[in-house]
């Protein structure tokens, strides 16, 4: 490795995602695509660090805690931060990529670097101590929104005890003035979601409000970040997985003050569910679309990637790929709530107030949005216009801006068995849809007509939400049935008086764990109430 400046590239994967998983995410694919070999003359060396997502512990209780409440987030943040501290030298560039809660993680890492800088150390023990001190100083502004004094008291006691122990051991107190404060060259994230992900939003929000602060104090992008890109999913239907956007209202103020470049931040929406955009499903063709967009944006910021790896991604990308069901199986217990993108727009549309995060407010305490405009990738329009599945997302707002495809996107010319040598590459991206199609979706009169047609469909969304709550209530009653079944009136007997149905229910003991036998016996003895709730 040369002794000149280098690029440090940090990766944090999503919940339950790791290098050992069979189906990879875009974070892992980006990690694979980074060129870590000897650079050409005048280019930088590149080193990278990949961190498994939260909820990947081999100890299952920790896996559940990580999946529901972000347990292990601090460890992930500090692991990535220490790698940057350990390897940074003056003049180095820093890149960071993440998906889902891994996106939340790298945004915290970037905010930590921008706020506290990178600590200097001469040993791993010193690095461990200083990095924890930097993290605690950074987290000082993270407080429960309602009940704050217990958190303040605990942190004050921890600081006093830590300072006392440090003096006994002859250690200097943590001083952020000793840290180096590099700019962040590029941050690329896919569909950032909150650190907690329980299916009942009120429970996780109550923890954040009253017990332990997990959310960010704000959604502003620090001025030390030179470029940031956010790929977002249009079609996910889980309330707990609504994305954490960057604050474009604050960004506009920075641009007007000429503190940042006007193209510094870009957030673009893509077809698909959460993992259709960030990756992780067996059929992965749709996720490559946002990956190629992110790769090209990072390359413009100086990142070097391997052509042989990227060519494979280009060949496999398809905006016509299958859209999966984000609420399949047990995920059906995540609250049903499609992403109404208009709810994030500023100024506020009063019709969307019930869908907004109540914590997002202006300096006067009034609810406000985070988006100035909605950017939709042209691949979305291509699927709407020419797709084979009648794709028509109801979540798009009335007006939006179409982002043209990248130069090496899914429509880039490729070699095949008929054309062994691909056509020459052009210097401008090839459009995916005609001007007429673009105009038909964005022209004011047709946009208003489209919005008028899709708005009544949200009435069916509310009906499905009622169905969700009915299902959740029936499930809870079914689980609690052994506690109150003795108080219920005797149900009507079957017409022929037979009780064979209980024997069939008892067959469940053959496939369920032993601790479930108590419930199975109650259900078998009370088949009327079992089928009333389960049916």
Predicted features and spans:
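Active-site- or binding-pocket-proximal scaffold segments within functional domains
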Residues: 1-535
């Amino acid at each position: 490795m040369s002794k000149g400046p280098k690029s440090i590239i940090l990766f944090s994967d999503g919940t339950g995602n790791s290098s050992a998983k069979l189906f990879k995410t875009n974070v892992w694919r980006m990690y694979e695509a980074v060129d870590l070999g000897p650079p050409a003359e005048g280019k930088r060396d590149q080193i990278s660090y990949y961190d498994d997502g939260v909820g990947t512990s081999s100890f299952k209780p920790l896996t559940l805690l990580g999946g529901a409440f972000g347990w292990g987030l601090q460890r992930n943040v500090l692991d990535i931060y220490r790698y940057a501290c350990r390897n940074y030298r003056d003049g180095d560039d820093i890149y960071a990529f993440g998906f889902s809660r891994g996106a939340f993680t790298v945004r915290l890492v970037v905010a930590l670097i921008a706020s506290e800088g990178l600590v200097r150390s001469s040993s791993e023990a010193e690095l461990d101590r200083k990095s924890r001190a930097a993290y605690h100083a950074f987290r000082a502004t993270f407080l429960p929104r309602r009940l704050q004094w217990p958190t303040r008291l605990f942190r004050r006691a921890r600081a006093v005890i830590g300072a006392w122990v440090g003096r006994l051991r002859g250690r200097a107190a943590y001083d952020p003035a000793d840290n180096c404060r590099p700019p962040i060259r590029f941050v690329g994230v896919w569909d950032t979601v909150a650190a907690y992900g329980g299916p009942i939003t009120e429970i996780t929000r109550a923890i954040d409000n009253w017990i332990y602060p997990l959310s960010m104090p704000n959604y502003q992008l620090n001025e030390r970040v030179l470029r940031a890109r956010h790929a977002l999913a249009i079609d996910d239907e889980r309330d707990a997985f609504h994305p954490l956007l960057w604050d474009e209202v604050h960004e506009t103020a920075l641009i007007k003050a000429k503190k940042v470049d006007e193209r510094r931040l870009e957030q673009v929406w893509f077809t698909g569910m959460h993992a259709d955009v960030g990756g992780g499903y067996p059929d992965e063709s749709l996720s490559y679309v946002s990956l190629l967009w992110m790769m090209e944006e990072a390359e413009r910021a100086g990142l070097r990637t391997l052509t042989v790896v990227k060519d494979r991604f280009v060949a496999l990308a398809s905006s016509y790929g299958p859209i999966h069901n984000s609420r399949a199986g047990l995920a059906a217990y995540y609250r049903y709530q499609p992403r109404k993108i208009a709810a994030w727009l500023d100024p506020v549309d009063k019709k969307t107030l019930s869908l907004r995060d109540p914590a997002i407010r202006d300096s006067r305490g009034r609810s406000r949005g985070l988006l100035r405009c909605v950017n939709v990738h042209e691949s979305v329009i291509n699927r709407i216009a020419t797709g084979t599945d009648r794709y028509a997302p109801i979540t798009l707002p009335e007006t939006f801006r179409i982002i043209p495809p990248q130069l090496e996107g899914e429509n880039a010319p490729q070699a095949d068995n008929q054309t062994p040598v691909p056509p020459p590459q052009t210097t401008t991206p090839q459009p995916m849809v005609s001007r007429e199609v673009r105009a038909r979706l964005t022209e004011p009169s047709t946009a208003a007509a489209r919005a008028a047609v899709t708005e009544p469909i949200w009435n069916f969304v509310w009906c499905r939400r009622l169905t969700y709550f009915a299902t959740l209530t029936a499930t809870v009653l079914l689980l609690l049935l052994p506690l109150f079944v003795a108080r219920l009136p005797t149900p009507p007997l079957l017409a022929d008086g037979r009780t064979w149905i209980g024997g069939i229910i008892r067959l469940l003991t053959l496939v369920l764990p032993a601790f479930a036998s108590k419930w199975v016996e109650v259900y078998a003895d009370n088949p009327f109430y079992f089928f009333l709730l389960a049916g």
